[in-house]
Amino acid sequence: MSVSAFNRRWAAVILEALTRHGVRHICIAPGSRSTPLTLAAAENSAFIHHTHFDERGLGHLALGLAKVSKQPVAVIVTSGTAVANLYPALIEAGLTGEKLILLTADRPPELIDCGANQAIRQPGMFASHPTHSISLPRPTQDIPARWLVSTIDHALGTLHAGGVHINCPFAEPLYGEMDDTGISWQQRLGDWWQDDKPWLREAPRRESEKQRDWFFWRQKRGVVVAGRMSAEEGKKVALWAQTLGWPLIGDVLSQTGQPLPCADLWLGNAKATSELQQAQIVVQLGSSLTGKRLLQWQASCEPEEYWIVDDIEGRLDPAHHRGRRLIANIADWLELHPAEKRQPWCVEIPRLAEQAMQAVIARRDAFGEAQLAHRISDYLPEQGQLFVGNSLVVRLIDALSQLPAGYPVYSNRGASGIDGLLSTAAGAQRASGKPTLAIVGDLSALYDLNALALLRQVSAPLVLIVVNNNGGQIFSLLPTPKSERERFYLMPQNVHFEHAAAMFELKYHRPQNWQELETTLVDAWRTPTTTVIEMVVNDTDGAQTLQQLLAQVSHL
C-alpha cells in the first residue's frame, strides 16, 4: 500500500466535491505538506489556478475573486504559520459574506505537541470566525469515501456566507508514483464521478417573507439608507426610493448613484437632521456604512420602525434600534415590497445636497487628495470597476464624490483593515476581466507591497493610484494627542514607490498636476497591463479640506 498514492486519492475526492458547489477559482501557496491537495487541484480541469508565495496575500486574492464572482473560492496552504496568515481574509469574509473554502494541510496527530517541525495546533485555531470548521482524520480506507464527500457537501451545502475551514492532516511519504492503492475505495462512489451534482444535496434556507404591513408603511414618511450592495441592486434601490418619494442616503459602496450627494457633509447640518426627525420609518438596505456623520445620525435617529435588509445573517445594527432584521437578497426583497408613487416629503435636504456639492466643486482645482476623491468619477474606465482602499481615502470619496449608478465598486469594509488591499484588488480584476481602477493610501500599499507580484498578471488594464500623504492621515481627523500624533499614529515613512514598481516590472508615473494625471490615465486604459500612479500630496490637505467643508456646509 502506498501512503502517498492514497493521500492523493483522498485529496481528489475533496477537490472534486468542491466543484459540485460552484468552486472554480482555487488559490495555491507553495508547500510540501499540502502536496496531495495541490496535485489533486492541478489534475482537476474544472479549476482556474492562481498562485502566490505569500499566504496572507493569497487569502485576500481569494477574497477579491469571491467578491466579484459571487462564487465560493478555495485556498490551499501548507501547515504551520502559513495557516495563520489566512486569518485576516477569513475575518473579512465572515463580515462581508464572501465564501472562502480554506484547505489547510496539517501534520498527523502523532506529530502535534511533541516538537515536530512546522506542527502547530490547527483545529479550531480560527475560533468562531469560520461558518463551518471540519477537522478531517488522517486519510484511511477504513473510512468510506461517502463519509468524506458527504461531510464536505454538508458544510458547503449549508454555507450561506463566510468561510469554511477544512483541516487536512497527511502523513508521509508525500511524494511517489501513483499505483492502484485506493482505487476501489474511490470507485465505491460509483457514477458520482461522472455526475455534476453533490453527493448530499441539502435544501436551501428559507428567505425572509413579505412584511404584511408594508402597504401601510410605504404610505408614511420614510428614509432609505443604502449600504453595501451589488451594482444591479444599487440601481433598483435608487428607483425604488425615488418612486416612494423617500430621501436616499447612499454609501460609497451602494452603487445607487447617490442622488443626494455629499451626505457625510450635509448630515452635519442641523436643518437636515431636523427634517430627518420627521421620518416614521427607516429602511436600511445593506450594511457596512462608511460616513461618520451618517453613522452618528443612524445611531441617534428614533423612527417608529427601523428595518435592516441584508443577505448576511446577524444583527448589523450597532445602535440596537427597535425594529426588524430581515435576512433576504436585496433585489428579491424589493420585488416583494413594491414602491407606490408618492411625492417627495423632504424639502431642505435636496437643497443642502446641491449646495454641498457646489462647495466641493469650488475647491476641485487644487492638486490634492480631497480633490482626487471628488474627481474620481471622471477617471473611471468604461465598462470597468472601482476598488477603494480603507482609512482616509474611502471616507473622502464617500463624502465628496458622486459615483455613477450601477457602476461596480468593491472594498474591504467588513473589518476595514488596510492589510491585503492590493491582493483583493488583484482578485477582483481576475474574476471580472474588467478594466479596474484601484485607489489606496501609501501605508496600505506598503502593507501589501509584495502583492505587486500579483498585479503582473492582469487580463485588462489595471491602474493602481497610491495617494502618498506620508502616513496615516486619518488620525488627523481624530482627537489624537498632537504631541504624540506623528510618532505613534501617523508614522510617516518618507518613501516613494518608483523602485517597488520597477522591481515587479510595472509601469510607473508620478504626475504633478491634473493634466499629467489625465494623460497618464488615457494611455493606461489602452493596454492590458498594470500602471502604478503615485500621487504625492501635502500630508494634511485632505483631512483639512474635509474639515473645512464640514464647517462650511454645517452653516448653510
From Swiss-Prot:
Pathway annotation? Quinol/quinone metabolism; 1,4-dihydroxy-2-naphthoate biosynthesis; 1,4-dihydroxy-2-naphthoate from chorismate: step 2/7; Quinol/quinone metabolism; menaquinone biosynthesis
Name of the top EC class for this enzyme: transferase
Gene3D superfamilies under this entry? 3.40.50.970, TPP-binding domain (3.40.50.1220)
Q: Which cofactor does it need?
A: Mg(2+); Mn(2+); thiamine diphosphate
Q: Which reaction does it catalyse?
A: isochorismate + 2-oxoglutarate + H(+) = 5-enolpyruvoyl-6-hydroxy-2-succinyl-cyclohex-3-ene-1-carboxylate + CO2
Cofactor: how and how many bound:
Binds 1 thiamine pyrophosphate per subunit.
A single Pfam family it belongs to is TPP_enzyme_N
Tree of life domain: Bacteria
UniProtKB keywords: Magnesium, Manganese, Menaquinone biosynthesis, Metal-binding, Thiamine pyrophosphate, Transferase
Enumerate the Gene Ontology biological process terms: menaquinone biosynthetic process
Annotated GO molecular function terms are: 2-succinyl-5-enolpyruvyl-6-hydroxy-3-cyclohexene-1-carboxylic-acid synthase activity; magnesium ion binding; manganese ion binding; thiamine pyrophosphate binding
EC assignment: the record states 2.2.1.9
Q: What does this protein do?
A: Catalyzes the thiamine diphosphate-dependent decarboxylation of 2-oxoglutarate and the subsequent addition of the resulting succinic semialdehyde-thiamine pyrophosphate anion to isochorismate to yield 2-succinyl-5-enolpyruvyl-6-hydroxy-3-cyclohexene-1-carboxylate (SEPHCHC).
Under NCBIfam families, the record lists:
menD
Subunit structure, interactors included: Homodimer.
Looking up HAMAP family in the UniProt record yields: MenD
Q: Which family, according to UniProt?
A: Belongs to the TPP enzyme family. MenD subfamily.
What name goes with this protein? 2-succinyl-5-enolpyruvyl-6-hydroxy-3-cyclohexene-1-carboxylate synthase
UniProt organism field: Escherichia coli (strain UTI89 / UPEC)
